[in-house]
Regions:
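Extracytoplasmic
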Residues: 6, 11, 21-24, 34, ...
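Gly/Pro-enriched, hydrophobic low-complexity segments
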Residues: 132, 191-278
């Protein structure tokens, strides 16, 4: 076929045959606060077009609250509000070590998630029916994962991202991290939240805090490996007081396509750890 012989009428005829407006979609990217009001007023054949919203990773979300001016709100403001809500910076800094244990059920098996933290080292263990399934240890120097008898050191770019969250209460470390940014407000499960984000080389984490209580209600961790993002979500609720510090007694955590509901069963402040706890 000779493309020079194609006429405007030919293009219109083919378009009318193969392009059905009822199945059409318009994809718009950009700064939402500058676009949304204009998009809401788009009228086609006497009807306003329906609008769907997606996050940076293509996941469908509720309509975010978009404002041009957040009155000077910063990531540091949000973090400080959270730290004050759970006990206050002075109280939190008096805790040098901590052990936290959650229990839940998945696929007919009992699941235990246990965290042991020092200021410069963290151990996360997952047990299924009493058997250790996975353990990850992160320090300032390295990070590794153990599964059964196998131990694998994580690459430097993984470690660089993971060590950003070191500390008994990681938000204290994040206060002075120049890479964490306030990205706006959203609605999560009918709750208005502040969103802050830490974008890493491999692992990026989005933290969501209740605007009014200051408490953290959700974390979304996205790991990008070879162009394939893996998303893990954790929800937090029903905070309880342990010696003057609030901890979420309910935690929902994604495990593959499933979500595990977990309950807080133990919190120990300033325990003594052995070297084995971090090996």
């Amino acid at each position: 076929a000779n493309i020079d012989k194609v006429t405007i009428e030919d293009i219109k005829r083919v378009a009318n045959k193969y392009f059905n407006l009822n199945n059409g979609q318009i994809v718009v990217t950009g700064k939402g606060s500058e676009l949304i009001n204009k998009l809401k007023n788009v009228n086609f054949n006497g009807k306003f077009l329906p609008i769907n919203y997606y996050d940076n990773y293509g996941k469908s979300i509720e309509e975010p609250i978009l404002e041009k001016n957040f009155d000077g709100i910063t990531a540091k403001f949000v973090i400080n509000k959270y730290l004050k809500a759970i006990g206050g910076l002075e109280k939190l800094k008096s805790v040098n070590t901590i052990s936290i244990k959650y229990e839940g059920d998945a696929m007919g098996a009992s699941i235990v998630s246990e965290e042991k933290k020092k200021n410069d080292m963290t151990s996360n263990s997952t047990l299924m029916n009493g058997n250790l399934m996975m353990k990850m240890v992160v320090s300032n120097e390295s990070a590794f994962v153990k599964q059964g008898a196998n131990k694998m050191d994580l690459p430097k770019n993984f470690h660089d991202d993971l060590k950003n969250s070191l500390g008994v209460f990681p938000e204290i470390s994040l206060l002075n991290n120049p890479n964490i940014k306030f990205i706006g407000k959203e609605i999560i499960d009918e709750t208005e939240v502040y969103a802050i984000e830490l974008v890493g080389q491999v692992i990026s984490i989005k933290f969501l805090y209740d605007v009014y209580s200051g408490l953290k209600i959700k974390e979304i961790s996205t790991t990008n490996m070879g162009g394939q993002p893996q998303v893990q979500e954790s929800k937090f609720g029903d905070y309880l007081d342990f010696n003057g510090i609030l901890f979420p007694s309910q935690k929902s955590q994604s495990l593959g396509p499933q979500s595990i509901e977990m309950k807080l069963v133990d919190v120990v402040l300033n325990p003594t750890f052995s070297d084995e706890d971090f090996n």
